[in-house]
Every structure is written in structure tokens, then in C-alpha cells.
């Protein structure tokens, strides 16, 4: 309801003062995106007994907020008197919700209820869960979850999806391959991952949790009683928050592991998927060492997990138990951070999905990707004082803009910093030791190093200067992209191979994944030698190919601009050359082939289509691309069917995990001179 009365206009003027406070907070204090929360009590409005909730955040940092806030009001049976929404130039949205006692006579203590609503606002900001948790088979369909319970439900479902197969098989097949070949190990690992993905879908997990909502609530209460901050607890029932009263009353929590086990065995078939899913939920509870779930001002929800409970020593997929795991979930993303020792460093990677299908694939593999990146980083860091770590964030489908990724990165960093504040009374710390994380740039985060460094400073972190490598020299750092530290490492291997094989003056046809917009891809182009002729480039925008050779000056122009290959001047292509955008549909190519889907063509070009358009490729330097892009399902495409030789004589794996280990061995056996990722880009680690 928008009002133009003089009284309301005066209130709007008062909002300007609030906005000034928010601007100062965004500049000098911790939270920069929101939400900013303020409760104006009835003492300021005695004449009409009016209460006011003021909620502000930056546009685009969450979704469906107004709808969700109204659901929150409905849950507490609160009626609004009027609502104002004001927008400001910085993209700031400011909601003013007005309530009167006359409209809410049925509420015993309106002040307490509104205070509770304000506390739970950050939950709907962090996790905009629009639909109610409903299962047609649910016998308790009239049992309504609280906002906190809904959030716990959503978070638990995400955790279970990623970790459930590790919880199912304590052996994980490790004994089967103890004395076997790497090829057999990779095949078994692949089948195990497929089994997990086909057996436990997101929908199945959500349906099972919905079917046993009361059990989920019992586990939530166990979680809440463990992690509810003591500063928020009080024996005075009038001072207790409504959420804490709900935790203490109603459904009883589980008081012991034995009680949970007995309940599960009595109510669930131990041969059913339900049994394993609910066991996994209990394991999630047990593994949480600290969380910001009950901190009011949060941008995302973070958990520090005990890795010994979620990774097993005898694991085929995970050969070592990490030192620490963080799990973060926000409005537009979720992610992990894995490190192998207390003091460890590694980059943070943001994964974007340009189609629903690619999102599902990225979702299925992101935990394995994060683990393998951290594990590889640990091996690369063996000659320096810091061990290895890595973080991977997966953006929700549809969120691919630069601003969306920056917002997600801010939330990821902020929520982890929340629970690095040692001995803070705002959360319960079951770990009990001080810990510091050290980040670095990776895919889609290189431009955020300065931002995150200054953000840590604004949060009051004493270690802010060492928080990230790759920051600008003005902050005491060495920008990785500017000085090309990883690129120089990769190029050294490429040029050394040329020298060893006597190819330094020989014309070589080169293919590259990872385009001129990326750190590694752009520098690889700028550092390329005169004897290299680019015949193909694949990046996030599409596929650029010319068997006669791409224009090197044009590629350098794009690399200096950090532009994607869709900006390439196509008038410079030969008659055989072409560019296919990921947005293209039903495009006819010079050889007569029709590309029905540009995204699928891009994703499969490095394998299925590469040799159809480029019969000769002498050098392949992956500078980007998804993990396991060359795997057991497509390795035969890289081998000559008649001779058994590798179709590409030289591969220097600049991108991490691009080729699976068994395929590396097959390519080497087929005569390929191959430098694996941990060797090719290790120079960047050492110099950074």
C-alpha cells in the first residue's frame, strides 16, 4: 500500500536517515549486501500503538523476499497495517512494514512476536524457499514446519545428496582395488558415482524427509539444543524467543544415539532408501562442529563439519580424510571448502551452468571436484610451508552474471568468517580451536581478490592481509593474471617439449579450451610462440574453429581485452572457419553439418567433434573446462583406430583435473607426450 499522506511522507524522510546509516555500514562495517534490520517499538508511536519493521538489502541479492516475508507473517498469524517500499540509487530496497495492536488483538505479545519475525528474516533472505514441503504420501500433511525447520530441511537435503553414498559403503570398494591397476580403479569409481546419482535424486531425498517430517523436527531440535547460543537462552519465559520456546516445547528431541537408532529401526525398513537417507541426516547433525545458523545478521548459512564422520578411511573416491570441511548454502549458490592441514591455501572456484542439463551434471560432481582439486593442491604444495585446500561454489541455474557471482562470493566469505570469530558468543564452538582459512583466485573469482581482502578487513579480521593471494600490489599482493605465474609455468613445459623434440621452429597446429577471457587462457595466447597456429578455441561463449588458422593478432586483441571468443571478428575466418555460440540453435556449418544446440556442441567439441573439423592437432593446452572432460567414456576418440597412437602428440594440462588418471596413462602408452595438471601449473603455486 503506497500512501501520500503528509504523515507518511515525513516517515519517508526519516527513512533517508536510515539509508544514510546503511550506506555507512556498507562502507565501514561488515555486511555490504544486507539484510539491514531495524525494529521500531511502540514507544515511538503511543498514540496509535504502532510497530514498524524496517528491512533493507541490495536488489538482486535474494529472490521472492516479499512473498516469503508474507509467508513468515502468516505462520505467526500476524496482519500488516500497511507496507511501504522505497528504492535508492545504489540498488537498495527498503521495506517498511507497519503493524498495529488493533489488527492483531489475538497476539498476546505483539512486541515479542515481531522481534522473533525480525530474527528469522535473515533465514528467508539466505534461503528463499517458496514452496511448502509437501509430499502426497505424507500422513502428517497438516503438520506445519517453522521457518527454522524449513531451512534445516533444505540444508539437510542438500548435504544428504552430496554425501549419502559415502555413508552407505564403509569399504567403498577400496579393498577390491588395493592391488589393481589405475584403470580398474577409475572404472569402479565411475560406476560408483553413477550408482549414487541414479539411486538418490534430490527429489527422492526431499520426499523421504517430507514423509518423516516429525523425525526431521526431532533431529532439528537435537541440532538446535546443541548449537543455540547460550547468550540467547534465558530461564525467563517472557524473555525467551519464540523459536527457543518452540525448541523446548512440543515434539521431544532425540536424547541419545541409541534412542534414534531404536526409533529408526522401529519405524523404517532398514533395506529401504528411506533408512539410509535418515541415517545420513543424523550423520549431518553429528558432524556439525559450529554454524552461524542462529546468528541474526548473516548473508548465507555455514557449517564447519567433522570430516572423519563424512569421509571414510577406506574410500575409493577419496583416498585421504581431509583435515577440515566447510559447507555453505545461500540464496543463489551452495559450496564447500576442503583443506588437508590446519595451515593450507588454495583457490576458490565458482562454477556456472549455462543450461539445466549442465547444472545437473555440475551438481552431481561438485563435491568430488572440490575434493580432487584440494587433494591435487596438497600434492603441489609439498615444497612450500602451506598445505593444500580448495573451495568450490556452484551457482544456481540462471545465475551467471558478474554481479550474481560477486554477491555469492561475498556471502561465501562472509558466512565462513562468521564462524572463524574465535570464542564469539554468537555461536556454539564444538571445535574449540582457533582456525584461519587462506584463499586464492580460481575460475570466476580472479577479479574479486581485492574485494574479498578489504571485506575481511571490514569484518575486523586480524589476518585480512593474508586472506587471499592474487590481490593487487597496492594491498601487498601479486596479481596472478597480471604476472602470469601459472601461465609461465605451463609455457615452460610447452617450450621445453618443443626444444627436447626439436620442434621450436616447426609449425604446430594448436587447440585450446579456456578462452581469452580467462587468466590462464589469455596469457597462453599472449605468450604463444610464432610456430604455433591456433586452429580452435572453446570458451564459455562458444566454439571458434578455423582449420586454416585463426588470426593471431585478433586473438591477442581479445586476450588483452579479456574478451570471450564471441567477440572475434568473423570476417577474418577462412571459408572453412566458423563460430558457434552457446545460444545458437540449428546453425549450418561450412561442411554442411547442422548444429542443433550450440551449448551441447561446445561441451562435446573437445572430444566428439574435434577431429571431424580438425583432422590434425599437434598441441592441446587445456586452460579451462570441466573436470574429467577426457574420461573412460570418450578416450577412444583420442586414439587412432588403426595404429593405436594418440591423435594429439603433445598435451600440457594447464587446467586442473581435465583428464582422468587412467586416461593420462592410456594417452602416454599411445605415444602422447603429456604433462599432467599438478606438474604443469605447479610453478604458479610456488611463485604465489
Which role fits each region the language model picked out?
Residues 1-90, 96-159, 166-175, 180-182, ...:
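Regulatory modules associated with amino-acid/nitrogen control
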Residues 68, 360-363:
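Long, Pro/Ser/Thr-rich low-complexity/intrinsically disordered regulatory tracts in eukaryotic proteins
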Residues 401, 497-509, 528-531, 547-558, ...:
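Non-transmembrane, aqueous-exposed alpha-helical and coiled segments at domain scale
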Residues 469-558:
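Hydrophobic, well-ordered beta-alpha structural blocks that scaffold small-molecule cofactor pockets
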Residues 273-319:
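Extended, Lys/Arg-enriched charged tracts that mediate electrostatic binding to polyanionic substrates
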Residues 95-98, 403-406, 432-440, 450, ...:
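Terminal amphipathic helices with adjacent charged low-complexity linkers/tails
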Residues 49-51, 346-354, 464-479, 578-593, ...:
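Gly-rich Lys/Arg/Thr-decorated short loops/hinges at beta-loop-alpha junctions or inter-strand turns
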Residues 161-162, 170, 333-337, 360, ...:
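Glycine/serine-rich phosphate-binding loop and adjoining beta1-alpha1 elements at the start
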Amino acid at each position: 500500500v503506497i500512501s501520500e499522506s503528509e504523515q507518511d511522507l515525513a516517515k519517508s524522510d526519516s527513512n533517508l536517515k536510515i539509508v544514510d546509516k546503511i550506506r555507512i555500514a556498507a562502507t565501514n562495517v561488515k555486511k555490504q549486501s544486507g539484510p539491514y534490520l531495524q525494529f521500531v517499538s511502540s514507544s515511538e508511536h503511543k498514540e496509535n500503538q504502532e510497530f514498524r519493521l524496517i528491512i533493507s538489502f541490495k536488489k538482486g541479492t535474494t529472490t521472492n523476499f516479499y512473498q516469503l516475508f508474507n509467508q513468515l507473517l502468516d505462520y505467526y498469524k500476524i496482519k500488516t497495517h500497511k507496507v511501504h517500499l522505497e528504492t535508492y540509487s545504489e540498488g537498495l530496497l527498503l521495506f517498511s512494514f507497519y503493524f498495529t495492536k488493533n489488527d492483531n488483538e489475538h497476539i498476546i505479545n505483539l512486541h515479542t512476536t515481531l522481534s522473533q519475525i525480525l530474527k528469522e528474516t535473515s533465514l528467508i533472505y539466505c534461503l528463499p524457499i517458496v514452496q511448502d514441503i509437501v509430499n502426497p504420501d505424507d500422513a502428517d500433511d497438516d503438520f506445519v514446519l517453522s521457518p527454522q525447520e524449513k531451512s534445516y530441511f533444505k540444508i539437510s537435503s542438500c548435504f544428504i545428496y552430496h554425501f549419502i553414498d559415502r555413508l552407505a559403503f564403509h569399504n567403498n570398494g577400496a579393498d577390491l582395488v588395493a592391488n589393481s591397476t589405475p584403470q580398474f580403479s577409475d572404472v569402479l569409481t565411475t560406476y560408483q558415482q553413477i550408482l549414487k546419482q541414479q539411486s538418490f535424486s534430490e527429489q527422492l531425498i526431499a520426499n523421504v524427509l517430507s514423509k518423516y517430517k516429525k523425525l526431521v523436527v526431532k533431529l532439528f531440535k537435537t541440532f538446535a539444543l546443541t548449537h543455540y547460543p547460550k547468550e540467547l537462552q534465558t530461564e525467563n519465559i517472557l524473555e525467551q524467543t519464540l523459536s527457543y520456546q518452540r525448541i523446548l516445547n512440543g515434539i521431544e528431541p532425540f536424547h541419545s544415539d541409541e534412542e534414534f537408532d531404536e526409533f529408526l529401526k522401529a519405524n523404517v525398513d532398514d533395506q529401504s532408501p528411506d533408512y539410509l537417507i535418515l541415517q545420513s541426516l543424523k550423520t549431518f547433525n553429528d558432524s556439525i562442529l559450529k554454524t552461524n545458523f542462529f546468528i541474526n545478521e548473516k548473508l548465507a548459512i555455514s557449517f564447519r563439519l567433522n570430516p572423519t564422520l563424512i569421509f571414510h578411511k577406506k574410500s575409493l573416491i577419496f583416498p585421504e580424510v581431509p583435515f577440515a570441511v566447510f559447507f555453505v548454502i545461500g540464496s543463489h549458490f551452495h559450496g564447500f571448502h576442503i583443506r588437508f592441514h590446519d595451515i593450507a591455501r588454495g583457490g576458490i572456484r565458482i562454477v556456472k551452468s549455462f543450461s539445466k542439463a549442465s547444472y545437473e551434471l555440475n551438481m552431481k560432481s561438485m563435491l568430488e571436484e572440490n575434493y580432487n582439486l584440494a587433494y591435487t593442491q596438497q600434492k603441489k604444495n609439498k615444497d612450500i610451508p602451506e598445505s593444500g585446500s580448495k573451495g568450490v561454489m556452484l551457482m544456481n541455474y540462471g545465475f551467471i552474471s558478474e554481479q550474481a557471482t560477486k554477491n555469492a562470493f561475498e556471502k561465501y566469505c562472509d558466512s565462513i568468517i562468521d564462524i572463524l570469530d574465535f570464542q564469539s558468543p554468537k555461536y556454539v564452538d564444538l571445535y574449540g580451536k582457533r582456525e584461519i582459512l587462506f584463499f586464492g583466485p580460481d575460475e570466476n573469482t580472479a577479479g574479486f581478490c581485492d574485494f574479498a581482502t578489504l571485506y575481511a578487513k571490514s569484518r575486523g579480521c586480524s589476518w585480512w592481509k593474508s586472506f587471499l593471494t592474487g590481490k593487487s600490489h597496492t594491498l601487498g599482493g601479486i596479481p596472478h593474471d597480471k604476472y602470469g605465474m601459472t601461465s609461465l609455468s605451463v609455457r615452460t613445459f610447452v617450450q621445453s617439449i618443443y626444444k627436447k623434440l626439436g620442434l621450436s621452429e616447426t609449425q604446430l597446429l594448436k587447440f585450446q579450451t579456456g578462452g581469452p577471457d580467462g587468466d590462464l587462457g589469455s596469457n597462453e595466447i599472449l605468450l604463444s610462440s610464432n610456430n604455433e597456429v591456433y586452429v580452435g578455441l572453446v570458451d564459455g561463449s562458444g566454439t571458434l574453429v578455423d582449420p586454416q588458422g585463426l588470426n593471431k593478432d585478433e586473438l591477442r586483441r581479445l586476450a588483452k581485452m579479456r574478451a570471450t571468443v564471441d567477440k572475434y571478428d568473423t570476417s577474418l575466418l577462412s571459408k572453412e572457419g566458423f563460430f558457434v555460440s552457446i545460444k545458437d540453435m540449428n546453425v549450418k556449418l561450412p561442411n554442411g553439418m547442422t548444429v542443433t544446440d550450440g551449448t551441447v556442441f561446445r561441451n562435446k567439441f573437445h572430444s566428439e567433434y574435434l577431429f571431424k573439423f580438425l583432422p590434425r592437432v599437434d598441441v592441446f593446452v587445456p586452460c579451462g573446462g570441466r573436470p574429467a572432460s577426457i574420461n573412460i567414456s570418450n578416450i577412444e576418440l583420442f586414439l587412432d583406430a588403426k595404429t593405436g597412437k594418440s591423435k594429439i602428440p603433445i598435451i600440457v594440462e594447464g587446467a586442473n583435473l581435465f583428464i582422468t588418471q587412467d586416461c593420462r596413462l592410456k594417452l602416454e602408452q599411445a605415444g602422447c607426450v603429456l604433462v599432467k595438471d599438478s606438474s604443469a601449473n605447479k610453478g604458479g603455486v610456488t611463485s604465489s
